[in-house]
């Protein structure tokens, strides 16, 4: 895969997106598969240098090109003439002379060139086509996705005799359909209903409008009462579609206050570093907050902002009231026990002293951690170098030492949750976590969300059966990833998914979204916070449906109306803006396909929103009791 330039097999203008582990459109309803799945299929084909290989579904030609660098000869069949001609031209330009391409029905194989030592099918069939099995040589391997488009399994069929075959299941996958006489017809729903019709969209908007429960302001007492239906849950996850919108913070604060005051919720956990949140928690509970101000690192505006500081001030007063009436306090936690933001800051500072060029690579890679990006728009600047790899051991040592110091501080500060057993567990897994984080990618996301889910579980266990927790995190964390491109295209999971799987009946997932407005975000990781204008949501997106419902603010209960739920099951684009916003590449950088009514239990809508108000850090390095935590 290092030899074949993948960027030569994508459409013009998409070169910078070539190396993200995600599929990319190449036209005619086809995609170039993500590098991981291409590598997996080739690996499972057990290719040898003298093999003759058939690929069904040439597409861009990338897989055939890879196979041609391993095997003696490749035969490739493509249904679309334009793609076949394009692939042939690419092979000629690159000097790959051992590939033959023809236009035809891939489900019938290539009988004249048979038998084959291996056949790789780059499209999903309802069942294994007989013709392909018959064109295998004795001992030949057929790699093919089989099943309906939402339940495909990757199979390896090995010919063991004249009429006998062995079959292995290699796991779940998602491919475009194989069209042909022995496969799907051209009327396959992936082609006929990929984009919802205008009539369907109009119907869905009307259903949203009818089901929408409007509110005038999150400050009205009637607003928080709307969420009483979720108060029986033990875990309530409150999302946001950006990390820089005032209304999202104000909404989560209003719901949290109501649940704390009236329904016994006593834990708040947020998408933040544990040490910073621990300083807030100590201050909320009358303890010395420690040296320094929390949330001083990028992206500091996420928690160092006026809207959140008001909620912190309310929790402080609430705990004072509780102390006076001999009630247990509200506790505040960060879900990132491994101190992700602090660790990244430590990595960048270290790399800056060793090699500024390597530090630039690290910044780009940390900017690509978001799962909704079709590809980091900066791949070329984020490619791994030997210098980057050479810093790995030193970085791991530095991050682990930082974690150990944090745990020591917790012990000296009498942090009852992070006891000796919990600290030992964290340190034992630290090296793996920091190594994965250093290189980024889907594995880093999965590891982080799994640890956050573990933290939620440990908090509930520690605080006892009466404990109830509210979680503040991005929609990409609190939504159920199984019903998004995160799972189908990148094999990623989410905190919301894991909470549902572990605590199904007592978990509520509530997303938040907007059509347009202002947002605080940076251009790149570690960049300057800026007030940016959001583009209006894209046509045929979930957000555009809500916008066309023509109501400025509302709650949408996705469980209450069967017709609404069914209408919003269909996959549509949904926008996700993190700490980085790149409006010029909006579609590729900030949208992915989701099933809204399966992803969340409810959705809170603001048609137009405003940027939150970042607070500048005070000059003093000590926590002043009168101005802590944000010095205003």
Please tell me what each predicted stretch does:
Residues 6-9, 141, 175, 235, ...:
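Generic structural signal for secondary-structure transition and capping sites
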Residues 100-102, 168, 333, 510:
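General small-molecule cofactor/ligand-binding pocket signal
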Residues 12, 111-114, 131, 155, ...:
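Short, well-ordered secondary-structure micro-motifs
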Residues 46-162:
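Conserved nucleotide-cofactor-binding alpha/beta core module
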Residues 154-156, 162-171, 329-334, 613:
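Short, well-ordered strand-loop elements centered on a beta-strand within folded domains, enriched
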Residues 191-632:
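Structured catalytic-domain cores with a bias toward divalent-metal coordination
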Residues 36, 114, 131, 247-251, ...:
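Generic recognition of short, well-ordered alpha-helical segments
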Residues 2-70, 83-100, 161-183, 187:
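Class I SAM-dependent transferase core
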């Amino acid at each position: 895969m290092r030899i074949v330039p993948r960027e030569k097999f994508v459409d013009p203008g998409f070169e910078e997106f070539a190396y993200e582990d995600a599929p990319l459109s190449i036209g005619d309803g086809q995609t170039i598969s993500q590098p991981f799945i291409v590598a997996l299929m080739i690996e499972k084909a057990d290719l040898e240098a003298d093999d003759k290989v058939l690929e069904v579904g040439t597409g861009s030609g990338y897989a055939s090109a890879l196979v041609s660098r391993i095997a003696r000869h490749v035969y490739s069949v493509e249904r679309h003439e334009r793609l076949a001609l394009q692939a042939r031209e690419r092979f000629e330009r690159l000097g790959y002379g051992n590939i033959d391409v023809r236009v035809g029905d891939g489900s019938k194989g290539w009988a004249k060139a048979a038998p084959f030592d291996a056949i790789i099918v780059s499209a999903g069939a309802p069942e294994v086509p007989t013709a392909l099995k018959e064109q295998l040589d004795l001992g030949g391997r057929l790699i093919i996705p089989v099943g309906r488009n939402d339940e495909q399994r990757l199979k390896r069929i090995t010919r063991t005799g004249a009429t006998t075959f062995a079959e292995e299941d290699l796991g779940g996958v998602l491919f475009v359909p194989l069209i042909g006489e022995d496969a799907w017809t051209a009327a396959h729903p992936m082609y006929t209903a990929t984009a919802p019709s205008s009539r369907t969209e109009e119907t869905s908007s009307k259903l949203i409008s009818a089901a929408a429960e409007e509110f005038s302001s999150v400050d009205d007492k009637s607003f928080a009462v709307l969420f009483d239906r979720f108060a029986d849950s033990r875990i309530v996850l409150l999302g946001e579609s950006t990390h820089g919108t005032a209304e999202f913070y104000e909404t989560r604060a209003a719901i949290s206050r109501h649940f704390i005051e009236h329904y016994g919720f006593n834990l708040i956990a947020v998408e933040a570093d544990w040490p910073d949140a621990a300083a807030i928690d100590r201050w909320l509970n009358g303890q010395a907050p420690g040296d320094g101000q929390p949330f001083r690192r990028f992206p500091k505006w996420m928690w160092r902002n006026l809207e959140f500081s008001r909620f912190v001030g309310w929790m402080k007063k609430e705990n004072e009231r509780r102390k006076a009436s001999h009630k247990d306090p509200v506790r505040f936690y960060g879900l990132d026990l491994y101190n992700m933001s602090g660790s990244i800051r430590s990595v960048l500072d270290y790399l800056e002293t060793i090699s500024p060029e390597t530090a630039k690579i690290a910044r780009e890679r940390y900017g690509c951690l978001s799962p909704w990006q079709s590809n980091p728009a900066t791949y070329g600047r984020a490619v791994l170098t030997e210098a980057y790899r050479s810093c790995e051991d030193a970085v791991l040592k530095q991050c682990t030492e930082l974690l150990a110091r944090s745990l020591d501080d917790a012990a000296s500060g009498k942090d009852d949750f992070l006891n000796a057993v919990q600290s030992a567990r964290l340190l034992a897994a630290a090296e793996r976590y920091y190594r994965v984080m250093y290189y980024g990618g889907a594995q880093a996301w999965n590891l982080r969300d799994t640890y956050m889910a573990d933290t939620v579980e440990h908090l509930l266990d520690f605080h006892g059966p009466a404990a109830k927790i509210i979680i503040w995190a991005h929609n990409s964390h609190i939504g159920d990833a199984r019903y998004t491109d995160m799972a189908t295209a990148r094999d990623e999971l989410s905190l919301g998914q894991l909470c549902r799987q572990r605590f199904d009946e007592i978990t509520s997932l509530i997303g938040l979204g907007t059509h347009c407005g202002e947002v605080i975000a940076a251009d790149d990781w570690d960049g300057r916070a800026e007030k940016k204008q959001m583009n209006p949501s894209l046509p045929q997106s979930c957000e555009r449906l809500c916008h066309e419902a023509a109501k400025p603010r509302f709650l949408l209960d996705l469980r209450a109306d069967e017709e609404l739920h069914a209408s919003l099951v269909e996959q549509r684009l949904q926008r996700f803006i993190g700490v980085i916003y790149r409006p010029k590449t909006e579609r590729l950088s900030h949208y992915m396909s989701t099933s809204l009514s399966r992803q969340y239990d409810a959705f809170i809508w603001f048609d137009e929103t405003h940027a939150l108000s970042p607070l500048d850090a005070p000059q003093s390095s000590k926590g002043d009791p009168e101005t802590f935590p944000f010095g205003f």
